[in-house]
Amino acid sequence: LILTQMAAAEEATVYSVVSTDEKEKLAYEAGATKVFRYGEDLAEQIKAENGGGVDVVYDGVGQDTFAMCLNVTRPRGLVCSFGSASGDVEPFKIQELNAHGALFLTRPSLKHYVATDDEFLMRAQAVARAVEEGTVKIRVHPPYSLENARQALSLIHI
């Protein structure tokens, strides 16, 4: 939801993909332009919405969505795989990126973006400023007991 809020604040067209009605509502509240549900024809639905795919995909799911991410990205677009909620992406032939239109692929890690004290401070200040200005709203849930850990974990994935 934070990424959606930040992209929407920059006036990007934001497509979110979710699995439940509640997550759909949250995505729209965060600024998503259009929300889709996981399904077999997801890439085709998104391409139909904007006439040919997206420039950038941010994927926190991993294994279950990686092929769709490649299919929905426009030629010379960027796929940013930052999570593995469904498991790690299987090894693949790098030529796949060319077959989908000379795509760029990255797997960022926070430690590489806060490698120095100056970088850390700059990024921390940017996040704090976004929260102070109301660009990013952080949802805080009440604490859950250990018996309700499964319920608490179900709330952290969009």
Regions inferred by a protein language model and the residue ranges of each:
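Non-catalytic, hydrophobic alpha-helical segments
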Residues: 127, 149-152
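N-terminal Rossmann-like NAD(P) cofactor-binding module of classical short-chain dehydrogenase/reductase
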Residues: 57-58
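Glycine-rich phosphate-binding loop and adjacent beta-alpha segment
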Residues: 10, 18, 64-135
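Mid-domain Rossmann-like dinucleotide-binding core that forms the NAD(H)/NADP(H) cofactor-binding site
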Residues: 1-40
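Short amphipathic alpha-helix with an adjacent loop that forms part of the alpha/beta core around
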Residues: 42-51
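Conserved small/polar residues in nucleotide/adenosyl-binding loops
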Residues: 156-158
